[in-house]
């Protein structure tokens, strides 16, 4: 069985306050208000039952659970854990289910202390039968901070008290001061209330302040800074500019992609490129301007501008110095410069090789290739020592 401890602390005036706050510790096992004793509540015999809060018309109505409706369960000859443990196991001192704290509705207007006490007597008199007997059953009252009185009645009468119109709660009372066995409130002795002293509510005020502090801490949102940081990050993601990303696919292409880039100057010891390379974009004139040309008799690359783009000048090797009288490579129209194949330039510290792939030079004399056509005289269009004997090649 669960044991619940609540505090006896009901809010002070004004009278139209929405709720009463208890800081007076007591157990809760009163019957359901404004309803007949039901079999469900009669069978639920907890040691200290919880009370539930239900808002009605802006007011808090707390209802405790009831124990046996006909006889006190403390007097059960066969107590067991299915109904309620014996009295020796009760944890709250003073909670004997004979002392009851009766909480009533706040009085209307600004009644005096005596008028408030008189209303308590009349309320209890509806149950015990007379005001005189009611006076003798009351052991404490509260006319400040909260409105309640303590009544020494049986558990059966506590059920009837709950059915009254002006009664909010009827709860088992317990000691507020265990050492002095004091239930708290303003003592009511022999049918009379002692003069009021603020000390009677000092303990309640302290307990009420502690309860308010606990409520304030519980109501404060947790992880406040973390929540603000999360909101700030979400706003940045929603409205801020997209983050800068590096370009996809790697670095940008080099400036001369798609064409033949000139080699770096003096790379590998070669001569620098001609000064006017790439300035004249027109193709160079063909070697034989006066008539048709024929392909060379060997597998050398085609002549300049012959049916397609000009191949590299040094295609697989080093050509002779004056390649058929063709213009030098300074007006190549974007073609790669000399020595693109890695071969040595003309007269690179040595004489070019005597034979170009084992075939005679391409542009020495075209007397045998033309058909009666006047060919220009290329007296000096052969490499020196072409045949190895020191004489020019004779066709």
Swiss-Prot record:
Residues 240-300, 335-355 have a biased composition (Pro residues). Residues 211-395 are annotated as: Disordered. The keyword Mitochondrion applies. It comes from the Eukaryota. It is found in: Mitochondrion; Plastid, Chloroplast. GO terms for molecular function: cobalt ion binding; mRNA binding; protein dimerization activity; protein homodimerization activity. Disruption phenotype: Dwarf plants. Residues 1-56 form a transit peptide. Residues 313-334, 356-385 have a biased composition (Low complexity). GO terms for biological process: cytidine to uridine editing; mitochondrial mRNA modification; mRNA processing; RNA modification. GO terms for cellular component: chloroplast; cytosol; mitochondrion. Residues 211-236 have a biased composition (Basic and acidic residues). Pfam families: MORF_dom. Keywords: Chloroplast, Mitochondrion, mRNA processing, Plastid, Transit peptide. Interacts with protoporphyrinogen oxidase 1 PPOX1. Interacts with PCMP-H52/MEF10. Homodimer and heterodimers with MORF1/RIP8, MORF2/RIP2, MORF3/RIP3, MORF4/RIP4, MORF5/RIP5, MORF6/RIP6 and MORF7/RIP7. Interacts with RBG3/ORRM3. Interacts with PCMP-A2/PMD1. Interacts with ORRM1 and VAT3/OZ1. Interacts with PCMP-H13/MEF35. Interacts with RBG5/ORRM4. Interacts with ORRM6. Belongs to the MORF family. Involved in organellar RNA editing. Required for the processing of numerous RNA editing sites in mitochondria and plastids. Binds to the plastid RARE1 factor, a pentatricopeptide repeat-containing protein involved in RNA editing. This is Multiple organellar RNA editing factor 8, chloroplastic/mitochondrial. The gene is MORF8.
């Amino acid at each position: 069985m669960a044991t619940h401890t609540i505090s006896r602390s009901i809010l002070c005036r004004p009278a139209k306050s929405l709720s009463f706050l208890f800081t007076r510790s007591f157990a809760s096992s009163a019957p359901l208000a404004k309803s007949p004793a039901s079999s469900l509540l009669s069978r639920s015999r907890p040691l200290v039952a919880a009370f539930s809060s239900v808002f009605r018309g802006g007011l808090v109505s707390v209802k405790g659970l009831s124990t046996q409706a006909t006889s006190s369960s403390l007097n059960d000859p066969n107590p067991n854990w299915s109904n309620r443990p014996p009295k020796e196991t009760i944890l709250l001192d003073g909670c004997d289910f004979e002392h009851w704290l009766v909480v009533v509705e706040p009085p209307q207007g600004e009644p005096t202390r005596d008028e408030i006490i008189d209303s308590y007597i009349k309320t209890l008199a509806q149950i015990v039968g007379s005001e005189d007997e009611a006076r003798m059953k009351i052991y404490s009252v509260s006319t400040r901070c909260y409105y309640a009185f303590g009544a020494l009645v049986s558990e059966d009468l506590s059920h009837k008290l709950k059915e009254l119109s002006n009664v909010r709660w009827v709860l088992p009372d317990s000691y507020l001061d265990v050492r002095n066995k004091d239930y708290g409130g303003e003592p009511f002795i022999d049918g009379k209330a002692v003069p009021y002293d603020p000390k009677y509510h000092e303990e309640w005020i302290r307990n009420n302040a502690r309860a308010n502090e606990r409520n304030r801490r519980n109501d404060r949102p947790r992880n406040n800074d973390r929540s603000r940081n999360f909101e700030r990050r979400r706003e940045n993601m929603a409205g801020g500019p997209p983050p800068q990303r590096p370009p996809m696919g790697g670095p940008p292409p080099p400036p001369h992609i798609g064409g033949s880039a000139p080699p770096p100057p003096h790379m590998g010891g070669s001569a620098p490129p001609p000064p006017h390379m790439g300035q004249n974009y027109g193709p160079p004139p063909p070697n034989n301007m006066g008539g048709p040309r024929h392909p060379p008799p060997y597998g050398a690359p085609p002549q300049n501008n012959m049916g397609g783009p000009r191949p590299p000048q040094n295609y697989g090797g080093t050509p002779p110095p004056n390649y058929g009288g063709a213009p030098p490579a300074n007006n190549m129209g974007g073609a790669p410069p000399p020595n693109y194949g890695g071969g040595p330039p003309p007269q690179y510290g040595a004489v070019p090789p005597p034979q170009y792939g084992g075939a005679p030079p391409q542009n020495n004399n075209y007397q045998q290739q033309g058909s009666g056509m006047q060919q220009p005289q290329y007296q000096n269009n052969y490499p020196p020592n072409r045949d190895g004997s020191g004489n020019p090649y004779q066709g």
